[in-house]
UniProtKB/Swiss-Prot annotation:
Pfam families: PolyA_pol, PolyA_pol_RNAbd. It comes from Buchnera aphidicola subsp. Baizongia pistaciae (strain Bp). Its EC number is 2.7.7.72. GO terms for biological process: RNA repair; tRNA 3'-terminal CCA addition. This is CCA-adding enzyme. The gene is cca. Mg(2+) binds at residues 21, 23.
Length: 419
């Protein structure tokens, strides 16, 4: 029995990146042998074992054979006759098909180290085309390593296009598509993920809304907010926002807010042809189709619904601001204020760029400080005054409105906080 370190740990070592997890492959063993050594078996499709002390994953060397459709239509042979090279051959990319033995020697039958040095994402074998999920994985890896200068090999991109042409992507579950997309959103350059999918024609299958935007070869002008949109600008914006925030819900909210607005602009008049309620209804359906988690959906819908209000919030009445806090349940979900502030400030700053004005004309911290002022109002004095029932709520609202009014009238403090 021999044990080898494989996969991402070796790849990241060559790239001088942090090693998150270490995966091991065991050659010449059986499940019974590992169980006798106190390993714990997990996994459904094929046996994976957790080390009794380190809890790192150990997998038996295996080969797979295509017997169905999608990324789950495989049978596995993990007998003790399977060799290390056979196991490495089934992996997606050459940079992930490198092993290291106990003496520190590298086993690299598919020239993965060379591809790491040359910054190339290359498939290991023609079997790459058997798993449609790998199309999304390669796009994600391209986004993950974009800052290092990685590119997809021409022959690999051709295979990805063939997989798409054969409608293999239709066999992927919505949940699995979202998991890969979520990981892509978590990279430093999530926009690259969508660009790769566009290049191999997968975007029209996975994200038809985004692909439709690509098909619009013109600038869209949103008269309501005086924004200029095109596909390049949207993804340039996503790239810039990703430098500001790593929150997936913030990144997702921005991307799909821009895209949805583009889809509902009349090209002849450049006017939004859908009202806010219809836009939110459409957005909810889109989130359901993509299996978007609730925490992302809530932020996205809230921003889409209240963007017009937020973009000029410093002109809104104190009463309307307090009512807005109640509508979004900010008292119990104060994190919404932070996320909406990031989104709103970013969009306003981009509007300022297109209108050639300075961002100093907009109170970037207004939303955050207004909420802090209102949130400091305590309910205890209200109770001591003998209020009960709905009277408590109404008095609390009144005091919060007055607090914001007094804060706004103090010009010195107001300007110091907001600008």
């Amino acid at each position: 029995m021999k044990v080898y370190l494989v996969g991402g740990a070796i790849r990241n070592k060559f790239l001088n990146l942090p090693v998150q997890d270490r995966d091991w492959v065991v050659v010449g063993a059986t499940p019974e042998i590992l169980l006798s050594l106190k390993f714990k078996q997990v996994g459904k499709g094929f046996p994976v074992f957790l080390h009794p002390y380190s809890k790192e994953e150990y997998s038996l060397a295996r080969v797979d054979r295509k017997i169905g459709v999608g990324h789950t239509g495989f049978s596995f042979d993990y007998s003790n006759k399977v060799t290390l090279k056979e196991d490495l051959m089934r992996r997606d990319l050459t940079i992930n098909a490198i092993a290291q033995d106990n003496n520190g020697n590298y086993i690299d039958p598919f020239k993965g180290i060379r591809d790491i040095k040359n910054r190339i994402l290359r498939h290991v074998s023609p079997a790459f085309s058997e798993d449609p999920l790998r199309v999304l994985r390669i796009a994600r890896f391209c986004a993950l390593f974009h800052h290092l200068g990685f590119r997809i090999a021409t022959e690999t991109m051709k295979i990805m296009s063939i997989v798409v042409k054969n409608n293999e992507l239709l066999n992927l579950t919505r949940d699995r598509v979202w998991k890969e997309t979520e990981k892509a959103f978590n990279t430093d350059n999530p926009h690259v993920y969508f660009q790769v999918l566009k290049n191999c024609n997968a975007l029209s299958v996975i994200f038809p809304e985004i692909n439709l935007v690509y098909q619009r070869q013109y600038y869209c002008i949103d008269n309501m907010y005086h924004n200029f949109y095109d596909t390049f600008d949207i993804f340039m914006g996503l790239a810039e926002l990703s430098k500001i925030s790593r929150d997936i819900d913030i990144r997702f909210s921005y991307l799909f807010f821009c895209i949805n607005r583009m889809l509902f602009i009349d090209t002849s008049s450049y006017i939004l042809v859908i009202n806010q309620k219809e836009l939110v209804r459409y957005f909810k359906a889109l989130c359901q189709r993509f299996c978007i988690p609730a925490y992302i959906k809530n932020v996205s819908i809230c921003f889409s619904r209240f963007y017009k209000f937020l973009s000029v919030i410093h002109y809104q009445s104190s009463k309307d601001i307090i009512m807005f806090f109640y509508i979004i349940d900010a008292w119990r979900k104060p994190y919404m204020i932070r996320k909406l502030s990031v989104l709103n400030n970013f969009c306003v700053s981009r509007n300022a760029y297109f209108k050639n004005i300075t961002c100093q004309q907009y109170p970037r911290n207004f939303l955050k400080y207004a909420f802090n002022v209102a949130n400091k109002i305590s309910i205890k004095p209200i109770l001591k005054m003998g209020f009960s029932g709905l009277q408590i709520k109404y008095e609390l609202i009144r005091l919060r409105i007055n607090a914001i009014e007094n804060w706004r009238q103090n010009i010195t403090v107001y300007k110091k906080c907001c600008f």
